[in-house]
UniProtKB/Swiss-Prot annotation:
Residue ranges, Extracellular side: 112-136, 235-363, 430-486, 548-551
Keywords annotated in UniProt: Cell membrane, Disulfide bond, Glycoprotein, Ion transport, Membrane, Sodium, Sodium transport, Symport, Transmembrane, Transmembrane helix, Transport
Tissue expression summary: Highly expressed in the lung, in type II alveolar cells. Moderately expressed in kidney followed by small intestine.
Membrane-side (Cytoplasmic) residue stretches: 1-90, 158-213, 385-408, 508-526, 573-695
UniProt name for this protein: Sodium-dependent phosphate transport protein 2B
Transmembrane segments: 91-111, 137-157, 214-234, 364-384, 409-429, 487-507, 527-547, 552-572
Places the protein is found: Apical cell membrane
Species of provenance: Rattus norvegicus
Coiled-coil segments on the chain, per record: none
Induction: Up-regulated by estrogen.
Protein's job: Involved in actively transporting phosphate into cells via Na(+) cotransport.
A GO term, aspect molecular function: protein domain specific binding
Example of a GO cellular component annotation carried by this entry: apical plasma membrane
UniProt gene name: Slc34a2
Sugar-modified residues: 295, 313, 321, 340, 356
Length: 695
């Protein structure tokens, strides 16, 4: 007999059998009785099933490696095949497909409209504050302050075109130089990427979908931040963007042209203008330093007005201020003259929901913000569900291959540049990089578009939004043509420079790796995604802006040590990953620091505890409301919420004693197995309780 009988005829499949063990034998068909094997004594030996826990393979077999979470999932079609349907089923399938397509277009339309209303809501909430940021000209000469002002203003108004138009107006009025406006343009480029990051939060229900969607959204953020980290110091030292755009304007003669074609606005404006209409000139007037604009409302009341010029008697300080000597007289106290005065006559009111409301801008903004976020979330959920039901089987295979497959060798390197052109063209059509990237985010989440393909599409959207700005600048009046065109060209060449830095060489595509790392963290700790948004788009810009108000010495004194600390951590992390041998033993990992300084687990425990306490309080409120409802209704149809039932069940389960599980002599058995059988069998000379389920 072998020294290790458990290993005889071993096979990874637990359904295989071994020989020489006694116990309850399964029935052997008559045709197999003649082929049963015998042992040395000549007695027949039956084959019995070996429980997995009795096999030494449980100890020596390595677990299979997990699948890569970044691999695109197989969207299998579990429905009835087309060939298996009858005529009625085929007709119903066609109508279902048409209905799903119509619903998809409808939800996509509501999705884009909700983004437009969301932008208006942000302008109502923070538009005047954004204008005040621009009106503080004392710190605009600081490039770092200009950068964070661009980020904050674009985040507040949720529109890079609005912030760019404010900058153009200030440059045309000589309130701001082109050199000081370039860092603000860079900040606006960063701030516009927050929209699709917010959209990615709506897919937090599924961890793998959220991992891909959040990484696909933040690849835009990392590209913009990395480009600014390199190009802002370069621009501050050499002013290459200013000189390059000056050279372009002097080389080519530009004339006033037509505005960029409104393709998407023509479809969405009839609906969004029924909800809210804003007077965006108020923000520009606040930025220009007009004190009277602070008391104006951003909500547009009168859409049709007429300006009339009339002659009116006005008082002047002295006769020298009169229009002419013939139109000047005094009454002994004041000097009067006749002047032309322009009066605006209101003709017709706007037709939107809030035109007759007397609510302040902040209240209307909060209402629209809440409603638009709810609609945005609902539309995104339905779009993902519809895409998940449509993109199955052969259709999904064709689309995934079309979007993610490279050109054949030796032209594979051209695929990414074609994707950049496609992204630029699509953004030019919809006239908004936020709309294009936000619509692409759910496709990344469900696995139709890979992160590697989404990256060049996102870079193309950055180019597309600048071409729209260039066409809009060409439609500007003559006094603002040069300034607006130069700023649009600065934005264009900034994005071109970023692409040259972070795309042509595969090794330099750091945004993809950083976005995947952040996606892994956010999938494990989903609260970290919200922290990322608040920290990088609100707290950090506000902190830098506050330090800029205190002056250069304070900004340098606080910022330089923080930057040096970040660089030290990055260098140490790189050495730990690449060359750990040159480091002391203590510095080869982060265990010398407290756990909360190098791990998110303690913070996750705190947040989980806080959310569970909030859930219990919420459930208590639900239980009270439920009981009041039952008392009022006088029936037993009302039921408490699901969370209340779960809490009550958990409390009951804690009071039920758990019976100790049966013990096993075999060391390969798990110590915590439940005894569900009553029969006893003898296997390999050892007695054990039979188990129908092993945990």
């Amino acid at each position: 007999m072998a020294p290790w009988p458990e290993l005889e005829n071993a096979h990874p499949n637990p359904n295989k059998f071994i020989e020489g063990a006694s116990g309850p034998q399964s029935s052997i068909p008559d045709k197999d009785k003649g082929t049963s094997k015998t042992n040395d004594s000549g007695t027949p030996v039956a084959k019995i099933e070996l429980l997995p826990s009795y096999s030494a393979l449980v100890l020596i077999e390595e677990p299979p490696e997990g699948n890569d979470p970044w691999d695109l999932p197989e969207l299998q079609d579990n429905g009835i095949k087309w060939s298996e349907r009858d005529s009625k089923g085929k007709i119903l399938c066609i109508f279902q497909g048409i209905g799903k397509f119509i619903l998809l277009l409808g939800f996509l339309y509501l999705f884009v409209c909700s983004l437009d209303v969301l932008s208006s809501a942000f302008q109502l909430v923070g538009g005047k504050m954004a204008g005040q940021f621009f009106s503080n000209n004392s710190i605009m000469s600081n490039p770092v302050a200009g950068l964070v002002i661009g980020v904050l203003v674009t985040v507040m108004v949720q529109s890079s075109s609005t912030s760019s138009s404010i900058i153009v107006s200030m440059v045309a009025s000589s309130l701001l130089s082109v050199r000081a406006a370039i860092p603000i343009i860079m900040g606006a480029n960063i701030g516009t990427s927050i929209t699709n990051t917010i959209v990615a939060l709506m897919q937090a229900g599924d961890r793998n979908e959220f991992r891909r969607a959040f990484a696909g959204a933040t690849v835009h953020d990392f590209f913009n931040w990395l480009s600014v980290l390199v190009l802002l110091p370069l621009e501050a030292a050499t002013h290459y963007l200013e000189k390059l755009t000056n050279l372009v304007l002097e080389t080519f003669s530009f004339q006033n042209g037509e505005d960029a074609p409104d393709i998407l606005k023509v479809i969405t404006d009839p609906f969004t203008k029924l909800i809210i209409q804003l007077d965006k000139k108020v923000i520009q007037q606040i930025a220009m330093g007009d004190s009277e604009a602070q008391n104006k409302s951003l909500i547009k009341i009168w859409c049709k007005t007429i300006s009339n010029v009339i002659e009116e008697n006005v008082t002047v300080p002295s006769p020298d201020n009169c229009t002419s000597p013939s139109y000047c007289w005094t009454d002994g106290i004041q000097t009067w003259t006749i002047q032309n005065v322009t009066e605006k006559e209101n003709i017709a009111k706007c037709q939107h929901i809030f035109v007759n409301f007397s609510l302040p801008d902040l209240a209307v903004g909060i209402i629209l913000l809440t409603v638009s976020l709810l609609i945005l979330c609902g539309c995104l959920i339905m779009i993902v569900k519809l895409l998940g039901s449509v993109l199955r089987g052969q259709v999904a295979t064709v689309i995934k291959k079309t979007l993610n497959t490279d050109f054949p060798f030796p032209f594979a390197w051209l695929t990414g540049y074609l994707a950049i052109l496609v992204g630029a063209g699509m953004t030019f059509i919809v006239q908004s990089s936020s709309v294009f990237t936000s619509a692409m985010t759910p496709l990344i989440g469900i696995g139709v578009i890979s992160i590697e393909r989404a990256y060049p599409l996102t870079l193309g959207s950055n180019i597309g939004t600048t071409t729209t700005a260039i066409l809009a600048a060409l439609a500007s009046p003559g006094n603002t043509l040069r300034s607006s065109l130069q700023i649009a060209l600065c934005h264009f060449f900034f994005n071109i420079s970023g692409i040259l830095l972070w795309y042509p060489i595969p090794f330099t595509r750091l945004p993809i790796r950083l976005a995947k790392g952040l996606g892994n963290i956010s999938a494990k700790y989903r609260w970290f995604a919200v922290f990322y948004l608040i920290f990088f788009f609100l707290l950090t810009p506000l902190t830098v802006f506050g330090l800029s108000l205190a002056g250069w010495p304070v900004l340098v004194g606080v910022g330089v040590p923080i930057i040096l600390l970040i660089l030290l951590v990055l260098c140490l992390r790189m050495l730990q990953a690449r060359c750990p041998r040159i480091l002391p033993l203590k510095l080869r990992d982060w265990n010398f620091l407290p756990l909360w300084m190098h791990s998110l687990k303690p913070w996750d425990n705190i947040i989980s505890l806080a959310t569970s306490c909030f859930q219990r309080r919420c459930c208590c409120c639900c239980r009270v409301c439920c009981r009041v409802c039952c008392m009022v209704c006088g029936c037993k149809c009302c039921r408490c919420s699901k969370c209340c039932k779960n809490l009550e069940e958990e409390e009951k389960e804690q009071d039920v004693p758990v019976k100790a599980s049966g013990g096993f002599d075999n060391t390969a058995m798990s110590k915590e197995c439940q005894d569900e059988g009553k029969g006893q069998v003898e296997v390999l000379g050892m007695k054990a309780l039979s188990n129908t389920t092993v945990f």
